[in-house]
Amino acid sequence: MNFKSTIGLEVHFELKTKSKIFSPSPVTYGAEQNTETNVIDWAMPGTLPMVNKNVYRLGIMVAIATHAHILPTTHFDRKNYFYPDNPKAYQITQFFQPLARDGYIEVEVRGKKKRIGIHEMHIEEDAGKNTHGTNGFSYVDLNRQGVPLLEVVSEPDMEDPEEAYAYLEKLRKIVQFTGASDVKMEEGSMRVDTNISIRPVGQKELGTKVEMKNLNSFDHVRRSLAYEEKRQEQVLLAGGHIQLSTRRFDEATGKTVLERVKEGASDYRYFPEPDIAPDHISQEWIDQIAKELPKSPFDRYDDYVNKFGLKPYDANVLLQTKESSDFFDAAVAAGADPTLAANWMNTQVNGYLNDHRVSLNDIKLTPEHLAEMIKLIKDGTISSKIAKKVFAETIANGTDPKKYVEDNGMVQLSDTSVLAPMVKKVVDDNPQSVEDFKNGKDRAIGFLVGQIMKQTRGKANPKMVNKLLNQELQNR
């Protein structure tokens, strides 16, 4: 018997705001426990939520980028449940009228394109964090309480783990390039819940779904879904039935483990939030946000390959992060040759970031620095070898490349009136190399170039030296 899978994903994005959704408390990853909270986060009696309007703006950006229909009126609702990290005993979310509905993302898997629907996206507040100590006590950190989240709920349109993986990759890149979230799974600013059911091929009725929550990497999503497909198949083939349940993925074993069985859908007794009035989202505001929306990664890719002539691989490396793409764009805007800029970004810059475990925001090299250094290489002022020394100084200390070259006498020697006599003398002093060259040994000229570079302390223009050497040797 063959089975067909049905997969849906719920993805939470932490929105990139300076303060929380309903309170003025700041949002800083890694802050000391309970240092970024106030009486609203604690749910003290008499306190009222104040909506951070920037949350709407960021959510609308994602809705536009995913072709979703933005509702003209949206409001918040209460989702009632009790848990220690939820001091109000309810979560403020959007249930009846979310921010947007009916979007989609197109993915390509195994050479075939497919449209994955987005059922809705809604805004809500995050909960705090529980930590269970070894002393029998549990500790609650409310720094995360009230951090704004955008939940993107897909339609159950995915039919295998690879489609789910492709959808997540595409969605993550879209959200990142809008600037709405930094989508760092390791910091919890992107979290994934999955739902999967299977049914015999030809059966219209969906099977019983199993949920897996808070998967912290795309690889875990793919592996957990693949395992769950096989597990459910084995249960059904053995004559059993699938339980409506929540499971977790065990990274060590690669298996899913039962957490709890559900008797039915949870009843959170949603009702409209009485302390927050409904908000009207005008078409004028939507149009304004659409105009301000950064260029998508897909449009950038077209520019990089078709306009700048970059190789697809180099374009994709630049588009790994919005910061990298923005840096490259700024360097080209400052006059850098696109091909050279991409090469330096993908090799030297990325190498430095990986070696020092820092981001582009942490270094002192600017796009203007990179553009200036590339100009110095192109016009022959410095060699590629010298450029690496200039790069090391600039990225570490922010030194102006041109000034550093001039102050340290690094200007490349290209004057033929100076180089020609040196070339003649080196050829005169090395008759064996001349003989080797005439006998077709290409390494001979490399030796002669090395002698001149040694005499000039690496300042001689290699192209010019090669040209003069070939001319001199041809005349011997």
From Swiss-Prot:
It catalyses: L-glutamyl-tRNA(Gln) + L-glutamine + ATP + H2O = L-glutaminyl-tRNA(Gln) + L-glutamate + ADP + phosphate + H(+); L-aspartyl-tRNA(Asn) + L-glutamine + ATP + H2O = L-asparaginyl-tRNA(Asn) + L-glutamate + ADP + phosphate + 2 H(+). Gene3D superfamilies: 1.10.10.410, GatB domain, N-terminal subdomain (1.10.150.380). GO terms for biological process: glutaminyl-tRNAGln biosynthesis via transamidation; translation. GO terms for molecular function: asparaginyl-tRNA synthase (glutamine-hydrolyzing) activity; ATP binding; glutaminyl-tRNA synthase (glutamine-hydrolyzing) activity. Keywords: ATP-binding, Ligase, Nucleotide-binding, Protein biosynthesis. The keyword Protein biosynthesis applies. PROSITE patterns: GATB. Pfam families: GatB_N, GatB_Yqey. Its EC number is 6.3.5.-. It comes from the Bacteria. Heterotrimer of A, B and C subunits. Belongs to the GatB/GatE family. GatB subfamily. NCBIfam families: gatB, PRK05477.1-1, PRK05477.1-2, PRK05477.1-4. Allows the formation of correctly charged Asn-tRNA(Asn) or Gln-tRNA(Gln) through the transamidation of misacylated Asp-tRNA(Asn) or Glu-tRNA(Gln) in organisms which lack either or both of asparaginyl-tRNA or glutaminyl-tRNA synthetases. The reaction takes place in the presence of glutamine and ATP through an activated phospho-Asp-tRNA(Asn) or phospho-Glu-tRNA(Gln). This is Aspartyl/glutamyl-tRNA(Asn/Gln) amidotransferase subunit B. The gene is gatB.
